[in-house]
Amino acid sequence: MAAATGSLLLRAPWSGIFSAHPLASALSIAGALFCLALLVKVLFFSFPTDNAYLAGGVSPAVTTGQYALCRHPGVLWFAGFYLALFALTRTSQMLWAFLLFTAADVLYVVLQDRYVFPKTLSGYADYQKTTPFLIPTPTSLRAMLRKQP
């Protein structure tokens, strides 16, 4: 995906993007960077730093921070990143990348949520009952704000 995204960005018609819509372009770049930063944070800095994931055993489910917002917040930031890139480039290729990559990510987390995490994360069944799958709710937003790690 990274190579495809890089290729799409390199082939985008950059000469007209900034001159025609400078504010929209700046907001799109800011949105893409914001979503990318949140994606990196949720994927790499939201888990315990001990060797729990390397031991091959069952680890506790993370239920604080962004993981109180929904069970798979990375999907939100991933989709937001590609949506911002589409808004920036305004190309049909980036629209297709947004749609296909996001659909693949959703399929991946459905499989994780149904088959992998219930077996590898302790307390995941309870977490599924209290936290929305993908779409945050006002209740989950309040929970996220209360449960900062």
Question: Which residues are covered by each model-predicted region?
Answer:
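Membrane-anchoring alpha-helices and their flanking helix-loop junctions
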Residues: 1-63, 77-149
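Short, amphipathic, aromatic/basic-enriched membrane-interface segments that mark the entry/exit
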Residues: 62-73
